Amino acid sequence: MASVSPSSLLLLFFALLSPLLPLTSALVFREYIGSQFNDVKFSDVPINPDVDFHFILAFAIDYTSGSSPTPTNGNFKPFWDTNNLSPSQVAAVKRTHSNVKVSLSLGGDSVGGKNVFFSPSSVSSWVENAVSSLTRIIKQYHLDGIDIDYEHFKGDPNTFAECIGQLVTRLKKNEVVSFVSIAPFDDAQVQSHYQALWEKYGHQIDYVNFQFYAYSARTSVEQFLKYFEEQSSNYHGGKVLVSFSTDSSGGLKPDNGFFRACSILKKQGKLHGIFVWSADDSLMSNNVFRYEMQAQSMLASVNSRDRAMYWSLL
């Protein structure tokens, strides 16, 4: 019987093990979709196979529908364009693109022209209702994750931290979702709530979708990098994703140096991913998803380099 060298056994071990090992350095591209009911579909958005791609359905809200929406204490329902972004369409895009995952975002800025408030009756009742209603929606729509985007609050920071923290902990424990993100921006009230959540439950949060487009439209590359460092400090240890919008809001736009800033962060090893608000706006713009393709191409180049380094070590 021929002998097998230790080095051959080691190579065989790594070859068998490698499909099970995640590429923890893989960068993620994320895009919000569905809030504006302008018939945008998953298939409209270009998807690079070499990035981890997340669609984020905007939004699920714990409010009644109708002309005068009111809070429902954690009883969520879909408020995105469910005709074009249905359960079957979620399943289809995930079947077609193995690198795609789909999550839903909670809250958002407004519904029916009025602010959406985080407004729990109590921590326990809100959490119970939220776990039940969101589990049902997530399973119905074949979703993978959840994003927290409340922007207005009637509860104090500690109540917000406990409600959201307990919710995401239970959803992960029950294997309903595999990842969680939060979407704060630079506003004193918003930051006080999200930083309280981060302090208590940051270990449950996988991505920080920081809304850098909420800064001034006059933001320079240097200012953008300064803001990134500030928010990386505020959410210490978190994967803070950089962002731009394709609507008329502010921040550092792609034409004004966004990708230059990303290149600097990439060289520093600080670029964790990019997210965009939103596919709805991109569909209607003159640049129809041009910047999404550019962002994914940048991220894919980093991922390809890291994969090459990974295999060279085997």
From Swiss-Prot:
Its EC number is 3.2.1.14. The active site is at 151 (proton donor). GO terms for biological process: chitin catabolic process; polysaccharide catabolic process. Residues 1-26 form the signal peptide. Belongs to the glycosyl hydrolase 18 family. Chitinase class II subfamily. It catalyses: Random endo-hydrolysis of N-acetyl-beta-D-glucosaminide (1->4)-beta-linkages in chitin and chitodextrins. Able to cleave glycolchitin. It is an enzyme of class 3 (hydrolase). Keywords: Carbohydrate metabolism, Chitin degradation, Chitin-binding, Glycosidase, Hydrolase, Polysaccharide degradation, Signal. This is Chitinase 1. Gene3D superfamilies: Glycosidases (3.20.20.80). InterPro entries: Chitinase-like, Glyco_hydro18_cat, Glyco_hydro_18_chit_AS, Glycoside_hydrolase_SF. Residues 27-296 form the GH18 domain.
